[in-house]
Every structure is written in structure tokens, then in C-alpha cells.
Design a protein with these regions (language model features):
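Conserved phosphate-binding catalytic cores of ATP/NTP-utilizing and phosphoryl-transfer enzymes
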Residues: 1-4, 114-141, 317
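Short beta-strand scaffold segments in enzyme catalytic cores
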Residues: 18-23, 143-145, 151-155
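Glycine-rich phosphate-binding loop plus the immediately following alpha-helix
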Residues: 157-202, 225-226, 230-233
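Glycine-rich phosphate-binding/hydrolytic loop that grips phosphoryl groups
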Residues: 120, 302-342
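N-terminal beta-alpha supersecondary unit
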Residues: 5-77, 83-87, 116
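Short glycine-rich phosphate-binding loop at a beta-alpha junction
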Residues: 74-85, 270-281, 300-303
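A contiguous, well-structured pocket-lining segment that forms one wall/lid of small-molecule binding clefts
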Residues: 195-275, 284-292, 297, 322-325, ...
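Conserved phosphate-binding/catalytic loops in two-lobed NTP-binding clefts
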Residues: 113-114, 275, 292-314
Length: 344
């Protein structure tokens, strides 16, 4: 007798994307709907929290309805609801969590509060319905999680078991991209703008520093950011036109080198079977190319559509919690500063 498929409804509202998704058996994407607020926040040069939460309130229920419709299903066919519990913006997280609780109560469904960072890890194994399945995960593995708010190096020995090896001591990688983009007067968000500007640039034009911290798996990008600032100031003082393409390419190369070298070193140290690179910054072509050009380790990088925040990854992680009976009650609170290493 065939085993019953397990369908999870995922809800994501941790920052400036409102998203819902239906996932079957932890990996098959039946639907994934995202409403982005990027254009609304551009004039602020970053996410404005109060605006973000208001926009989530407007968008979230229609987004969930659309995700269910695209999956040709209803709440009656869903086995559990997974929602981002943290980390993220408190006002944004509450919107998703409260609606998830209401739906779970109304439909008598289990609810699972998922860590946003573990969601990014599980995005690496998702694939759309009707396409070729992605390879199953092999443990142990090292996951590099790089986004606007986080730069984390995680050792994962089995499902839902995480050991934080290191993280950023100052700016996250995505935050550094945004700040340098502003220095170069490039539009928000900084990641895509830097990548676009770097296309015709020389990555060796400026020898920006790489903070290769010894005896630690931590990262630091503040020195690199300061070096770009000083270079820009020096060029302006001497009335030279800013070589935007070269500056962008050189900065991007420095970030890529630091992330790549540290991750490969950790993979070698812990004798892992594969590497995952995930989070918004994993959409960067230079970073993707660096990892794909090495042959020592199998590498999983999600497709571009799953690098930025989405609900498919929340449902994907939620499936494994459901299978392990890691369920929450309706009284749980959101956790804006929730670290990933809560289960080791």
C-alpha cells in the first residue's frame, strides 16, 4: 500500500517578502507564491519595519489563498502548517504567526514554528512538481548561510541537528553589499546592483583586504567595507571619476574569496560529504561560480528563485519537524533573534 503523501502549508513573513507555499513530502513544490516589497522600501535604502508589517497584513491572506489554489488543494487536504517563527523583524513575524495560528485553529491542524535560517538550508533540496528530483541530502554537511542579516557557517550531522561553527563579527555579507552599493551610489538592494556593476569590471583592479581570521570560523567584513570607503574618498578628493565597475568587481571578489575559503576549510576539517550555500547572497553569480568550479565537494545551491526569502523552504523544513513530532502549541511567541544552534 502506498504511503500517504504529507502536505505542508508554509507561511513566511520575516522581513519584506510575504509568501506562502504548499510542499509535498518535504521536497516537492506544489506552489510557491511571493509578494515582494522591495520597490516600496527602495526610497528608504533598506527595509522600513513599520511599512513592512503593514504590507504583510494587506498581502498575507490573498497570498495563502493563491498558494492553495495553485496547488489545487484546500486546508482540508493539508497535514500541518509551518510558519517562520524567527529570526526576523518582530512586527513582520507576528503577522505570519498570528494568521498561521488562526488557520491551524480553524482547520484543527498542527502548527510548527520554523527557524528562518534552517529554512534556507532546506531550500537546497526542493524541486518543482513535474521536474527532475534534486539529490537527497548526505550528512554530515556544511551550510554557508549568507543574507542581508546573517552570515553563518553551520555543521549539520543529520536532519534538524545544527552546530554553529561561526558567523559574522560585524556586518553580514548582504549588509556589506548594501552599504558598499550606497557608497557607489548604486540602487537598493545592493547585491544585484553590485553584481550588475561588476560585470564589466576588473576584480583585481583594487586589492581590497580579505579578513582571514585564524583559529576561528567567524567572518568579518567591516574592514573590507572601510577599505572601499577610503578608496572612494581618496578618488573623490583627487577629483577622479569613480571606476564603479572595477570597485564593484574588486569588492565582490573579496567577499567571495572570504566566504569560499572559510567554507572549504570547514568542509575539509569536518570531513563532510557536501556543502550547501543558501540565503539571498547565494544568488550572486561570482559566489555560485566559485563553489561550482571546485571538485572536492558536492555542492547544493538553490535555484535563484529559492535563494531569497520564500515559504517553500519553511514548508520544507516544517515537514521534517512534522515527521519528528516537533510541533508547537498555539501560544508560541515569535523569536526575532532566534539562533539556529538551538538543537545540537
Amino acid at each position: 500500500m502506498d504511503q500517504k503523501e504529507i502536505r505542508i502549508l508554509g507561511i513566511e513573513s520575516s522581513c519584506d517578502e510575504t509568501a506562502a507555499s504548499v510542499i509535498t513530502d518535504g521536497r516537492i513544490i506544489n506552489s510557491s507564491v511571493i509578494s515582494s516589497q522591495i520597490d516600496l522600501h527602495k526610497k528608504f535604502g533598506g527595509v522600513f519595519p513599520e511599512l513592512a508589517s503593514r504590507e504583510h497584513v494587506k498581502a498575507i491572506y490573498p497570498i495563502i489563498e493563491e498558494a492553495l489554489e495553485q496547488a489545487h488543494t484546500s486546508l482540508h487536504d493539508i497535514d500541518a502548517i509551518a510558519v517562520t517563527r524567527g529570526p526576523g523583524l518582530a512586527g513582520s513575524l507576528v503577522v505570519g504567526a498570528n494568521l498561521a495560528k488562526a488557520l491551524a485553529l480553524a482547520a484543527d491542524l498542527p502548527i510548527i514554528g520554523v527557524n528562518h535560517l534552517e529554512g534556507h538550508i532546506y531550500s537546497a533540496w526542493l524541486y518543482p512538481l513535474g521536474t527532475k528530483p534534486s539529490p537527497e541530502p548526505e550528512f554530515p554537511l556544511v551550510a554557508l548561510l549568507v543574507s542581508g542579516g546573517h552570515s553563518e557557517l553551520i555543521l549539520m550531522k543529520e536532519h534538524l541537528k545544527y552546530q554553529r561553527l561561526g558567523g559574522t563579527l560585524d556586518d553580514a555579507a548582504g549588509e556589506a553589499f548594501d552599504k558598499v552599493a550606497r557608497l557607489l551610489e548604486l540602487p537598493y538592494p545592493g547585491g544585484p546592483s553590485i553584481q550588475k556593476a561588476a560585470k564589466g569590471g576588473d576584480p583585481a583592479a583594487f586589492n581590497f583586504p580579505r579578513a582571514r581570521l585564524t583559529d576561528t570560523w567567524n567572518f568579518s567584513f567591516s574592514g573590507l567595507k572601510t577599505a572601499v570607503l577610503r578608496t572612494v574618498e581618496d578618488l573623490k578628493r583627487s577629483h577622479q571619476e569613480l571606476p564603479i565597475k572595477d570597485l564593484a568587481a574588486s569588492f565582490q571578489a573579496a567577499v567571495t574569496d572570504v566566504l569560499f575559503d572559510k567554507t572549504i576549510a570547514a568542509a575539509e576539517k569536518y570531513h563532510v560529504k557536501e556543502i550547501i550555500v543558501a540565503g539571498g547572497v547565494s544568488a550572486n553569480k561570482a559566489l555560485r561560480d566559485a563553489f561550482r568550479s571546485q571538485a572536492r565537494f558536492r555542492v547544493h545551491i538553490p535555484p535563484i528563485s529559492l535563494c531569497t526569502d520564500n515559504a517553500a523552504m519553511i514548508a520544507g523544513a516544517g515537514y521534517y519537524h512534522y515527521k519528528h513530532s516537533n510541533l508547537d502549541d498555539l501560544s508560541f511567541d515569535v523569536m526575532p533573534n532566534w539562533p539556529l544552534s538551538y538543537q545540537v
